[in-house]
Amino acid sequence: MEFYPGFDIESRTQDMEFLYGDDVFGPQPEKRTLEAIRSSLQDPTCTGPEILYSIVMDVGRKQDKAAIEERNLLYGAVTYAKGTLGKEPVRSQGHIHAISPSCQSSTCEVYEIWDGEAFIYMQEYGKDDAGNCYAVHAKAGEVVIVPPGWVHATINANVEKPLTFGAWCVRDFGFDYEDVRAHHGIAYFPIVKEGNITWEINPAYKHAKLHVISAHAYPQFALEPGKPIYTQFVE
């Protein structure tokens, strides 16, 4: 991988599996299929990879497991296939983080790209007025934070290469798909044109304003650029 995440984990993209070092814990991956997200795509009848992405929730070094659990945190890793879904790149359908029972609120997610490049797409609301929408372009080693309560989706920004990333979230996480499914997708569809990603409004929304930006540092949260967010937790 282009960026070392701070512990011994590897993505085996040819069969969408993860390999763990001897000192690393983690589950068998869950694999998400094209069939599962068709209704959220611009073209629900499109063809594309059968397995879109593989996800392992709750991974890390065995020596850190108790500390992660005590802080009610969970670290996950995901690999996305390369390729397209009709005119769109491989992506997730989008969701909002449900109310966490322990926090009594929706919670944020902290992404870190390990290999490839991504657009972390987010929109303020899931209703007819989506409000401000951001497509944040992130490369290996860069971090993106999704605020609580925002609709968000992960998009492989390079259709020629798989995407792998890690993310911190609350341990008692949950996903709310209701608003996204009611609108047959997110407010802007990513469209591949001549190898680049462009954006087309989803007509199911009455209003939305898109901002396409690059990933940036987060000094306000004391995150050190270039240092794995897993390592920063340990330290």
Mark where each language-model region is.
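Active-site region of the double-stranded beta-helix
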Residues: 1-138, 156-235
